[in-house]
Regions:
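Residues that scaffold, gate, or flank divalent-cation-dependent active/transport sites
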Residues: 1-80, 85-87, 95-102, 111, ...
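Short, charged/polar, Gly/Pro-enriched secondary-structure boundary elements
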Residues: 86-91, 131-135
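Compact, charge-rich alpha-helical regulatory domains located at protein termini
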Residues: 38, 126-165
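Secondary-structure boundary elements
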Residues: 106-108, 165
Length: 165
């Protein structure tokens, strides 16, 4: 569980799946979160350090250069990897996205990987699609995002809330 100070109180900003299953949510007071977490070694709480996150994401982007020369961090927790023209070096797009996913898993990260002809479609499918690995064929973008929630449009929270009503 990662926390930060907000108006003289500690609140949860991120939590692992284990803490989420226990009922811990972002924005919750740390005292409330602790009451939901059994006193076991898995219950680890520390102060969130966004600077460390940014440095780690940059380092991860550097490691991903083995897949493409065009890699950029997508803060707070993603990478853009432009694979245009690199598929043949990896024996196909399917093998390439599986290699990216496998590399992230070996480094201890969960990864959702999507390939599409546009960045917006790839981002939406990676973040909200039903599968952890996805290839959207050219011309199938509308079909791929049709059933995704409004949040997949990468709009401001206010705009997304308005559209969701």
């Amino acid at each position: 569980v990662l926390t930060r100070a907000v108006n003289a109180r500690e609140v949860v900003v991120h939590r692992c799946d284990w803490a989420a299953r226990a009922g811990v949510r972002a924005g919750m007071d740390l005292a409330h979160a602790r009451s939901l977490l059994p006193t076991q070694p898995e219950a680890h709480v520390e102060t969130h350090r966004p600077d460390r996150d940014a440095a780690a994401l940059h380092a991860l982007a550097c490691r991903a250069l083995r897949f493409s020369p065009l890699v950029a961090p997508d803060a707070p927790d993603g990478l853009w990897i432009d694979i245009t023209g690199t598929e043949r070096l990896h024996k196909g797009e399917d093998r390439l996205i599986r290699a990216v996913s496998g590399a992230m898993t070996r480094l201890g990260f969960g990864a959702r990987v999507a390939s599409a002809s546009t960045y917006g479609c790839a981002w939406a499918v990676a973040h909200y699609g039903p599968h952890g690995l996805a290839i959207v064929a050219p011309g199938r973008e509308r079909e791929a995002i049709a059933d995704l929630p409004v949040g997949a449009l990468r709009l401001s929270p206010e705009t997304a809330d308005g559209l969701g009503e």
